[in-house]
């Protein structure tokens, strides 16, 4: 059984005292050296084992994931196209990325993770691979002191790094502190082996990977090749058409399982959704 499998088993069997959002926020500000991070693993594991609630979530995330929210209905539609594709095999490992910074890919990834975990047959695991500018831990009110960087760089066991988010069936492995060599870690054999194990075990688990934007990090292209599919976030008024086209051409259209149009004016979005019903791609806030 691989390390990822053991980590999931330990995470599922764990129980403990919930960590408050205030203490989590403080721990995220403290920083600290790499060695200090590893020495406090027992404290981090206690945070991960807790049955925390969504009280520590970013307010925008709490509002957008409200089951009665009109925004969340959009993510239900995207969830449906992922779980029940019309003409291609179901993608179980998915990269969420954008072509440029500031397009909202981290926020989209968090919302999609929440939507996927509400399906009765699936669990969702999120990995924050944007080592330069991580966002997922902050959105969920979770410490980012340790994470995937420690697994790749210091051989820390995944069971210490997997965090509960406060929503059943939704877990997160944060990025950890920004490393000096993000590209080398992403492209390492250890990362490739992790993705292989993610793909081969636990068929009820869907994996979402938040990656650096395409125009910022060249390793995003390589990262995409390890995963089943890609969701590309395109922000209204920000994304450049030529960059989007180039990225899609590099990956191949079959690799794209969804396009998320973020930041559309409400009236424009409504008109677009009406026109695109039944089409293979998805369009959201």
Question: Which residue stretches match the model-derived regions?
Answer:
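Conserved Switch II/interswitch segment of TRAFAC-class P-loop GTPases
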Residues: 213-216, 227-244
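P-loop/Walker-type NTP enzyme "switch/lid" segment
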Residues: 50-76, 80, 87, 99-102, ...
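Active-site signature of alpha/beta-hydrolase-fold catalytic machinery across serine-
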Residues: 111, 115, 138-139
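Conserved beta-strand segments of the P-loop GTPase G domain that flank and frequently precede/overlap
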Residues: 95-97, 174-175, 208-210, 232-235, ...
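Hydrophobic positions on the alpha1 helix immediately C-terminal to the Walker A/P-loop
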Residues: 108
